[in-house]
Structures are given as C-alpha cells and as structure tokens.
C-alpha cells in the first residue's frame, strides 16, 4: 500500500485570504448574460443553457482561460450566491414578521 507521502497533494495550493462578498457575486450573477448555445461540432438541434465562457471570465476573473468554465468555479459562484440569497431571505422574513406585528397593532388600535 502506498504511503501518504507517495500520494499527490490535490488540495488547494494557495487558499485566498481575501474574503468573498456573496452579495457582490450575486449581483454579478444577475448581470451575467445567459443564453442557449451549442458547440460548433454539435448538431444544430443540440442546445446548452448558460453563460458564454468569455462573459464568465470577464465577470468573475476565474479559471485558466476565457474559453471554458471550470465546474469548480461554477459550483463556487453558485454556492456563494445561494448563501447570499439565503441571508437576504432571512432578512426579508424578519421584516415581514415585524410588519405583520405593526399591522396587528395598528388594526387593534383602529378597531377599538
């Protein structure tokens, strides 16, 4: 059995210490052009849905080039966007609770 030292290190080589602003990424996702397209070698009936790699590279500056979108980058952008949406949803839920309480209080005052 090979030792751990013989195994290639597949982990991140240089993790970033720069924080990611999920709300900024979410805004970038919202502005990213999404279209249907196909590769040149595919039959005309074949369609894919998503951003063009060039737009992706310009928007996020991720990956090796502007001709492909790495799944790891797409997953990361998706997950941080979901986190931002989850946070926004929580804020909106709290606001709805507060507004309902205010409405009940106002309704109670006017029904007296």
What annotation goes with each model-predicted range?
Residues 48-49, 67:
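Parallel beta-helix/beta-solenoid repeats that form elongated, surface-exposed shafts/blades used
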Residues 28-32, 59, 85-88:
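Structured segments of extracytoplasmic/periplasmic soluble domains
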Residues 8-19, 35-47:
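Active-site-adjacent substrate-recognition loops and nearby beta-strands
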Residues 1-3, 10-22, 63-112:
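C-terminal intramolecular chaperone/auto-processing assembly modules
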Residues 56:
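Active-site-adjacent helical/loop segments in soluble small-molecule enzymes
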Residues 19-31:
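Periplasmic N-terminal gating module of Gram-negative TonB-dependent outer-membrane receptors
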Residues 49-50, 75:
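Residues that recognize and position ribonucleotide moieties
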């Amino acid at each position: 059995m090979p030792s751990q030292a013989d195994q290639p290190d597949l982990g991140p080589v240089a993790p970033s210490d720069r924080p990611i602003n999920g709300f900024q990424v979410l805004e970038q996702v919202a502005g990213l052009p999404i279209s249907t397209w196909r590769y040149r070698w595919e039959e005309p009936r074949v369609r894919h849905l998503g951003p063009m790699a060039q737009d992706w590279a310009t928007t996020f500056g991720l990956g090796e080039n502007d001709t492909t979108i790495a799944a790891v980058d797409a997953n990361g952008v998706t997950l941080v966007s979901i986190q931002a949406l989850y946070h926004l949803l929580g804020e909106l839920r709290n606001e709805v609770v507060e507004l309902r309480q205010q409405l009940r209080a106002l309704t109670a005052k006017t029904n007296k």
